Amino acid sequence: MKSASDKSKEITNKVKKLLEEKGKEPLNAARNLIFKNKAICKEIRDALKYFMYEYWNDLTTPTLLCLSCEAVGGSAYQVKHIAIPLIMISGAIDIHDDIIDQSTKKEGKLTVFGKFGSEIAIITGNFLLVEGFTLLNEFYNKLPRNKSSHISKIIMNSLFELANAEALEISLMKKLHNGKRVKPEEYLQVIELKAGDIDGLFKIGAILGGGSKAEITLLGQYGRYLGMLSILRDDLMDLKDFREIKHRIKYEILPFALLCALQNFYVDSNTFTFIKFLKSIKRVNDLWDVVIKSNGLKKHKELMEDIAAKGYSILNNLRYRKYYLKLLLDFLTLT
């Protein structure tokens, strides 16, 4: 019988292999197309080269499109061409998000903002947006009008949700640092909105694969749950990374588990005390003491289990190639 550690490694390796198999070709195509533009100045070209080849490796976008398409009986080829512009747009959002969050480094690597400054980062993100939407428009012209219109509305809605999520997160962060209590349920709204992009990817894949209205809706719901699990898993990972969690305490909203811990401080004036305490922490273990003793970690894991259960239940109503969709849920619930 395999140990929990061996099972975790097996699932992780399967997901890595899946991402490489489904995502590598579209990602490389996106990289090649970007650098065909000869009008890019050296400063932007350097930033793009760093971002696309050294910092960022978006295998996720094309993989999720592919899995959704296959889940309704379609093939990877049907989503190949839309994956390229969506990779670019996703990259632009990532660059701009780092500026908003003042993130100069992630996972040991400098962000574009951290390496080149805010001005170059903004322009680089804008370039990717323009390139992405230009290619997206070309793709629309090759589709039946009803499909292109449907996909366009989904993409716009996903972008609006992301924008609303950022605005709400900034509002909650300011509220927290002004000594007001932020409830975990308020942050959960941010998580649900941020998961809108994954919801959108799964709907698009299902549309291009010829899925029924019911299948498109189901896969969108699955994508929403998957996106929420990914964010909550990142929250837990941040709690293990001292540099990242100190940055979040200073510039971003607290992870869900810490907001649950904050509920022990019912009086608004005590929120200052809690934030001051978090800023004074010198070791990751001290943070874990807080989230464990306050039941914050327990509530965090219970939330993830509840969301995962909803995701698994959706798989019962899908007809094709559900194995990889289950694998992703298994991976995101590893702790």
Give names to the regions the model predicted.
Residues 1-114, 168-181, 308, 324-335:
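Conserved N-terminal diphosphate/IPP-binding helix and adjacent helical/loop segment
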Residues 5, 285-335:
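C-terminal charged capping/lid subdomain of soluble metabolic enzymes
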Residues 29-32, 36-41, 52-62, 123, ...:
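All-alpha helical catalytic cores of prenyl diphosphate-utilizing isoprenoid enzymes
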Residues 45, 49, 80-83, 152-159, ...:
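Short, well-structured alpha-helical segments
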Residues 60-63, 88-91, 95, 128-132, ...:
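Amphipathic, well-ordered alpha-helical segments in soluble domains
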Residues 67, 72, 95-116, 133, ...:
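Acidic, Mg2+-coordinating active-site segments of isoprenoid diphosphate-utilizing enzymes
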Residues 76-78, 143-146, 212-213, 265-274, ...:
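Structural helix-adjacent loops and short alpha-helical linkers that scaffold large soluble proteins
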Residues 118-129, 135-136:
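Aromatic-rich carbohydrate-recognition surfaces in CAZymes
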